[in-house]
Regions:
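A common structural junction motif
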Residues: 76-80
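Short S/T/G/P-rich N-terminal loop/turn motif that feeds into the first structured element of a domain
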Residues: 1-54, 61-73, 84-103
């Protein structure tokens, strides 16, 4: 079964436009590096402007594949950019799938 990797961050609502801009800009830095990784099935980047939250969710073929993001230079470079605008991150978690629905 696939592995779901979840990275969550929080930001002050006054910085929502900065957080959104940086998330959009991160696509340029990350897209080709991510698509080159073996095992990537899906990748989602989202923002909740009401609660001041952002999320990166990815789905991987295996736990080993998901952990490749732990050392991906392009990904590691993004964190301090977001933190400079006040984004704080929770611990990244990797969830082994127990069941799914795919309509």
């Amino acid at each position: 079964m696939p592995v779901v990797r979840i990275s969550k961050g929080k930001f002050d609502l006054a910085n929502a436009s900065d957080a959104e801009r940086l998330l959009l800009e991160s696509e340029r830095a990350l897209r080709s590096a991510l698509t080159a990784l073996p095992g990537l099935l899906h990748y989602y980047v989202g923002i909740d402007r009401i609660h001041g939250a952002l999320t990166n969710v990815s789905v991987w073929a295996s736990l080993e594949d998901a952990h490749r993001l732990d050392t991906l230079p392009q990904m590691l470079a993004q964190r301090p950019i977001l933190e400079a605008t006040g984004v704080t991150f929770e611990v990244i978690t990797n969830h082994e799938t127990l069941w799914t629905i795919t309509p």
